[in-house]
Amino acid sequence: MKAAEGVTVVYVADTRKAMEDMVPFFFDYPSRKMRMIALTGTNGKTTTTHVVSHILEQAGYKTGVIGTIHALIGDKELPTHNTTPDVIDLERLLWQMAEEKVTHVCMEVSSHSLVMGRVEGVEFDNAVFTNLTEDHLDYHKTMDNYAKAKAILFEKVSSAGQTKGNKAAWVNVDDPYAHVMMDAVDQKVADLHTYSMSDKTADLYAFDSRFTGKSSAFKVIYEGKTYQFETRLAGRFNIYNTLGAIGAALSEGISMETIAAAMKTFHSVPGRFELIDEGQSFTVVVDYAHTPDGLEKILTTAQEITKGRILVVFGCGGDRDKMKRPIMGRIAARYADVAIVTSDNPRTEDPETIVKEVAAGVEEVKAEKPSLQVEVVVDRRSAIQKAISLAKGDDIVLIAGKGHEDYQILKDKTIHFDDREEARKALKESCAARF
């Protein structure tokens, strides 16, 4: 390659690696000017990120949020296209946050971004591991590879030669892959902490949990003292999310009393066990659960809070891990009374083929559970309408898979589609039909 006259050309072995080094330099290393809190795990990243941000704001700090739903600077919302933006967009966003005097950034960090080096130039101060369950195996191939990818974050937060002190790592010790994250932490650099709902020796231990359809209450032991927590987040899985957020906040110097008070005023995250209320007698929930573990967690939560039947509307995305399709079918069938299999984001695949692969798992369980009602409705709007029409009294309808998303990706186009909007329309139409 011949350079134009007067233009300096630098030849490198790896252009991506060079960009990872150059871009933070160009933006004057913005992550060094703020406290960087990273949240990683298969499920719970988004909720935990927003809870940490809320706690810090209640403590008087200005926060930035980067994640699946959006990026936030205070209350100002900015669109994002990936859970973790590419290196240029990320560093530009961090620079903007630093310019606007953000003190703490709460950031979801995906396994893809860690492997691909998107966060290579970011100096993290505080890292939280939520859990690791089957997902993204089309990319990572094995769970061990997936775990190693997540562990890169804990190597980063405790790596030598960083510009800031007070490094911390918080790990959900109840997860089978917790040891992978813990082993990655250099405890000479970062403080390693654990949280749990089953291990009393963990640094944060939650117990005596009680649930309603709209809230949770539980106690936490920390440094020998017991604290009472109340939150509007429903379900056992949200106690885990809250514990991770509590840990991160403690490492930022926030008192337990301030954290507990903040949790009372935290509202749900869009599309995360979001209640849809149009005055109906039954409960309707929209949730982003799109992994086997995520689906199982919202279904077990439904069992804890529901006296009536569980109706679940769900599917699997196209051009993604095909192995999880029958698994999710089996999980839905195991916990639900009515399983409605439908389309998610089919992308370039045939929606009917995807639905058949998911339904195969449902049928396996139905052979042993004849009471299970199974409906296959490829059109997602019709599937939601079907669930609403079948529900009554103390039932709960779970609409899983898309959560906050307001689009559906088809083979040749992307259309507007929001589960929450569709649920509200179906509820209003159902109410009108009954009266």
Task: Place the predicted regions along the sequence by residue.
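Acidic, Mg2+-coordinating active-site environments of NTP-dependent enzymes
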Residues: 2-6, 126-284, 362-368, 372-375
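A short, gly/pro- and small-residue-rich
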Residues: 6-17, 125-130, 148-151, 192-194, ...
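N-terminal leader/targeting and accessory segments in enzymes
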Residues: 1-21, 207, 230, 234, ...
